[in-house]
């Protein structure tokens, strides 16, 4: 299944292929509102940048930094990185080595985020402590074989969640990843094999990191998940055509239980996920055809099948003389149907794209696809009874989404463009680039969270969270431009817009990004000691005038936010590609603002608004030897 935040590749060696594979994948689309831990930290994760804050906006690009000359220098195997600021600190030790037949890497890291104040001086009880290790070993016996094995341990402790009713006091993941390439290194006649296993252990409660109100119950949630993915694909090139065929299998076991603390100890009062065992099969075929050097078409077909067995769906909970309904009883009450036996959903996907490159400075692409998205466990198997709109009852009878999607993209470059901030052959006037993209997605059976109000197919009217299939429209557009103003000074900008509509209920979709704009100005130059750069960026977000904020007519997830603008400063210097210092100031003018939050590990179904941090200063360094 998907879970890109849960199951990242150990991206240490180069990817096996440049071409995108599985063009008609069922994993292309994510839920409108997602729940998953943050990405695992790999050697490619930027350090020395500001410490991640869950409640600030995500940048549209990585700020340029000459410190990358140090962090990407592989001629010296050992690297130490650290940063500190008024929000917290982070440290990493990374060792990389490559020989004629062997290559490997190990790393250890720690991150700590403190409570902080927002721009008005109000304290926000957020923060976490995170640590982990990674080890990877690769073996290349000859040009036609490559094998790689990697292990990651990632642990997050005391993750305060002010937007949520509970705090994630423990999240631990163990990820084991194995890869094999058999055949040509350029993927012209090659078999690729991948095996990946993850163990997730998570505990959340409402009492360790916050004060529980008198007479309020003290509760905790314990989550265990085990997932194994096996993938095999074959890729072949003949003339100007390439084909990929692949088969994937996934096994997922997911159990989550809610407990109330009583004088007799912790007693279960509900299952969030009642021991779900899923088998996922995915078969795909892709084909690429270079008609001429300027024209390429590509297409793909896929078949996706997901079977889920909820082992404890008929197991009720009990505390003393108080009985709590089994998951199947809840599903019967809300949807009029219990889940008998296993639940299987399947679908076919198709994708077609045409790319036109009239010159090396222009590229145009149009793509159309019709793909499914399978329902995820929170959407269909959650079984948490509650009162006053605090219950959450998934819908086990959800259908897969059907996305009918068209996308357009174009890139134009001047004759002097080499990269951002770099000029080709001294052609300053031609050192520019424009990128634009737009997409339109008409979704049949879109899976939406909602509240029980006796809608068609809903048998309760108590305001608890439910899931439904509706029709929806999603539209997105963005345009970006970059220009070198001199051999040292460059500027760039990006504007992004999203639109979402629940067509069945004639209301705005929840959790849709408002109009945003980003502008940056960057200076880079050489000095006797090495090189340095300075930069400033402005981020603007429009007020969220389209939102789902009324719990009596919709989900009520969104809260009104005003438009805002914030300015960040940053810079770095490095000497001899060996030692670098980075520094910066975020939220320079100390504005209080609420950012659109697209990080799934902060998702809450009944969220409280959380402001971004006040003005923050950070200083980092890295050193390799």
Predicted regions and their residues:
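Signature of Gram-negative outer-membrane beta-barrel scaffolds
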Residues: 245-247, 251-363, 367, 374-375, ...
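Membrane-embedded beta-barrel scaffold of Gram-negative outer-membrane proteins
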Residues: 102, 191-206, 357, 363-369, ...
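Transmembrane beta-strands of outer-membrane beta-barrel pores
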Residues: 82-86, 99-101, 110-114, 151-157, ...
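Outer-membrane beta-barrel domain signature, especially the mid-to-C-terminal portions
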Residues: 122-125, 164-167, 203-208, 258, ...
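Flexible loop and strand-edge segments within Gram-negative outer membrane beta-barrel domains
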Residues: 113, 144-191, 195-227, 258-261, ...
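Short strand-turn segments of transmembrane beta-barrel domains in outer membranes
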Residues: 24-97, 122-126
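Gram-negative outer-membrane beta-barrel transporters
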Residues: 290-297, 306, 427, 433-443, ...
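Transmembrane beta-barrel wall of Gram-negative outer-membrane proteins
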Residues: 83-112, 121-157, 168-190, 236-241, ...
